[in-house]
Curated annotation (Swiss-Prot):
It catalyses: tRNA(Phe) + L-phenylalanine + ATP = L-phenylalanyl-tRNA(Phe) + AMP + diphosphate + H(+). It comes from Xylella fastidiosa (strain Temecula1 / ATCC 700964). This is Phenylalanine--tRNA ligase alpha subunit. It is an enzyme of class 6 (ligase). Tetramer of two alpha and two beta subunits. The lineage of its organism: Bacteria, Pseudomonadati, Pseudomonadota, Gammaproteobacteria, Lysobacterales. Belongs to the class-II aminoacyl-tRNA synthetase family. Phe-tRNA synthetase alpha subunit type 1 subfamily. Its EC number is 6.1.1.20.
Length: 333
């Protein structure tokens, strides 16, 4: 081996390093020159075969060459990485003058909106919002509410029963029973939540939301009931219309009534729409919860939240509320 060979090898190596166009090629050169079997490494391994008088000089020369090539590799790597970063910054450049992307605006479900609207109106009238269990026993769901044993609501085809006799509540009236058992009159409360019945069509769902209200006091009358519900309907729909109380039967009230409103349709015609049920609390219900019906009277009412949502938002099919179609729900955001 002669010095000229080393100088020639060095010049070629530095030229190849300087000409490398990407990091992969540069790594290939590093292995070819300085790797375990690289050309410079092999030269260093051959030093032992040289005469003693040449070994030191050539060894020093090879070490300088190795350091020189190593520095050149690092410099070229830094240059390639810098160039790659600059290109990426140019390619990924953001035009700050472009309009920003608006985030998706979320909104409450129309049933939730309606539920909150109803409870807020009754809160202004002094009613306390109370919750209760969705799995009930026969006593709280039927017996305490004066349902006779033969009443069709107790039938398997109308109610979802568990094997132990418990059931999914068919109304929120059971919450009223629990509340009256723990509180003494005078009292005002509403019970809101999910209820379950074996029914499904365009205007009925196996699960829906119901709000029931109760007032107990001395000398409460049907006139008070009519005034309360008429005020609620005006506040909810934000308009005045004729309200009709039509006699009807419910086991837990006497007398009972259905409430109809004179609803103006899209073609400007008017028809009566049933919107809720109500009545004076039956003396047997008060007796079952230990309240003296000779001293206290009261009224109760119940309404379907989805029914009111359909009327407020002009929805024809109740099932649309539960299909989670974003195109439908986005209208109410």
């Amino acid at each position: 081996m002669v010095i000229n060979d080393i100088e020639s090898l060095t010049a070629q190596a530095l030229a190849e390093v300087a000409a490398a166009q990407n990091l992969d090629h540069l790594e290939f050169l590093r292995v070819a020159l300085l790797g375990k079997n690289g050309s410079i490494t092999l030269q260093l391994k051959q030093l032992g075969k040289l005469p003693v008088e040449q070994r030191k000089a050539i060894g020093e020369k090879l070490n300088r060459v190795r350091d020189l090539i190593s520095d050149a590799l690092m410099d070229r790597k830094a240059a390639l990485e810098s160039a790659a970063l600059s290109k990426r910054l140019i390619d990924e450049r953001v035009d700050v003058t472009l309009p920003g992307r608006r985030g998706e605006r979320a909104g409450l479900h129309p049933v939730t909106r309606t539920l909150e609207r109803i409870t807020e109106i009754f809160a202004r009238l002094g009613y306390e919002l109370v919750e209760g269990p969705e799995i009930e026993d026969d006593w709280h769901n039927f017996e305490a509410l004066n349902f006779p044993l033969h009443h069709p609501a107790r039938a398997m085809h109308d109610t979802f029963y568990f094997g132990d006799g418990r059931l999914l509540r068919t109304h929120t009236s059971g919450v009223q029973v629990r509340y009256m058992s723990d509180h003494r009159p005078p009292l005002r409360m509403i019970a809101a939540g999910k209820v379950y019945r074996s029914d499904s069509d365009q205007t009925h769902s196996p699960m829906f939301h119901q709000i029931e209200g109760l007032l107990l006091d001395k000398h409460a009358t049907f006139v008070d009931l009519k005034g309360t519900l008429s005020e609620f309907l005006r506040a909810f729909f934000e308009r005045d219309f004729e309200v009709r109380f039509r006699p009807s039967y419910f086991p837990f009230v006497e007398p009972g009534a259905e409430v109809d409103i004179a609803w103006q349709q899209s073609d400007s015609s008017v028809r009566w729409l049933e919107v809720l049920g109500c009545g004076m609390v039956h003396p047997n219900v008060l007796k079952n919860v230990g309240i003296d019906s000779e001293c206290y009277t009261g009224f109760a009412f119940g309404l379907g939240v989805e029914r009111f949502a359909m009327l407020r938002y002009g929805v024809d099919d109740l099932r649309a509320f539960f299909e989670n179609d974003v195109r439908f729900l986005r209208q109410f955001s």
